[in-house]
């Protein structure tokens, strides 16, 4: 009897201290399935099979976008907003939105390359009909910051946010580090649609 109580107490303590959800049943199967599919995708992409069979070949940026899409989906299903909280409708919705923001790059990569980012150079102040890339890119950045907060913690989010703010408000910084500042279009376009920012070397590796 005492052993059973001790086990329950230990289980509750581990659940409270763990940053991840204690998934069971259908939720566990869904998360495990997504993780397995992600792993298979990574193995396929890194293998010579796409070149041998001439199928399933991915360019660099679309492949990285798919990778981040899987990561964001799992992040919101595994890491709760608050410790011990079960998967909510909000978690499911935000995971799908985050994945869509990434997969947009995969599905419309050729159009993005053909347009050369022309839409993203339209100043926001002159056009209230924001380009879809600007909307999805902004959402993607915010969702990525929230996923980072859940999985790693607030300090890294604060650091990343400071650099984003510095990029936008650079003209107001001390003279020694000041710059002209990026428009919202250019900032989002660079961060979300370029291989030198979010989809850079860390994801590529």
Label the model's feature ranges.
Residues 53-60, 118-205:
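Hydrophobic transmembrane alpha-helices of multi-pass solute/ion transporters
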Residues 1-128, 134-138:
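Conserved, well-structured core domains of diverse proteins
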């Amino acid at each position: 009897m005492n052993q059973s109580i001790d086990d329950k107490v230990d289980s509750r303590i581990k659940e409270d201290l763990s940053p991840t959800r204690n998934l069971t049943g259908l939720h566990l199967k869904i998360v495990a399935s997504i993780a397995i599919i992600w792993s298979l995708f990574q193995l396929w992409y890194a293998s010579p099979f796409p070149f041998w069979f001439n199928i399933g070949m991915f360019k660099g940026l679309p492949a990285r976008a798919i990778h981040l899409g899987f990561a964001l989906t799992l992040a919101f299903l595994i890491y709760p907003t608050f410790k011990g909280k079960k998967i909510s409708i909000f978690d499911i919705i935000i995971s799908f939105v985050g994945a869509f923001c990434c997969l947009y790059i995969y599905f419309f990569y050729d159009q993005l390359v053909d347009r050369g980012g022309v839409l993203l150079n339209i100043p926001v102040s002159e056009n209230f009909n924001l380009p879809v890339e600007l909307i999805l890119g902004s959402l993607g950045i915010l969702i990525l910051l929230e996923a980072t907060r859940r999985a790693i913690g607030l300090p890294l989010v604060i650091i990343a946010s400071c650099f984003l703010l510095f990029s936008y408000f650079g003209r107001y910084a001390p003279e020694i580090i000041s710059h002209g500042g990026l428009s919202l279009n250019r900032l989002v376009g660079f961060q979300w649609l370029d291989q030198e920012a979010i989809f850079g070397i860390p994801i590529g590796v």
